[in-house]
Amino acid sequence: MTRLAEILDQMSAVLNDLKTVMDQEQQHLSMGQINGSQLQWITEQKSSLLATLDYLEQLRRKEPNTANSVDISQRWQEITVKTQQLRQMNQHNGWLLEGQIERNQQALEMLKPHQEPTLYGANGQTSTTHRGGKKISI
């Protein structure tokens, strides 16, 4: 097996791992109740896999071009198909994330009128205004 074939096989394995992580991301975003630490872990996994993929791509570009090799062409075609599938999946996950952000914004907007305004007092410290009552100090 040539060095280029080994690199392409490694790229394919990383893409498979990336699909697994993106499947987890999709399931997590579809649940409706988001666990921030779980989503952060998924994001870190994706970043790590993408960095590995970038490194392998740099190695691949340094290898001599053997475009006429059927074996290499088949491997590259598989990588291209996987990459296109992952791009579509990433776009779908992005839509799910945007929907979640929008729901969070709506929830915050609903809570905003019920939040007591925070004001600065004469001493420069924050204080909240009290509604409907008198503040008495002795």
UniProtKB/Swiss-Prot annotation:
Q: Protein name, please?
A: Flagella synthesis protein FlgN
User: What domain of life does the UniProt record list for this protein's source?
Assistant: Bacteria
> What Gene3D superfamilies is this protein classified in?
FlgN-like (1.20.58.300)
Q: What does this protein do?
A: Required for the efficient initiation of filament assembly.
Q: List the disulfide bonds.
A: none
Protein family according to the UniProt entry: Belongs to the FlgN family.
Main localization, broad class: cytoplasm
Could you tell me which residues belong to the region Disordered?
A: 117-138
From the broadest rank down, the organism's phylogenetic lineage runs:
Bacteria, Pseudomonadati, Pseudomonadota, Gammaproteobacteria, Enterobacterales
Kindly state one GO CC term assigned in the UniProt record: cytoplasm
| Keyword annotations of the record | Bacterial flagellum biogenesis, Cytoplasm
Q: Where in the cell is it found?
A: Cytoplasm
**Sorted alphabetically, which Pfam families does this protein's record hold?**
FlgN
InterPro entries per record: FlgN-like (IPR007809), FlgN-like_sf (IPR036679)
Per the UniProt entry, what are the Gene Ontology biological process annotations, in alphabetical order?
A: bacterial-type flagellum assembly
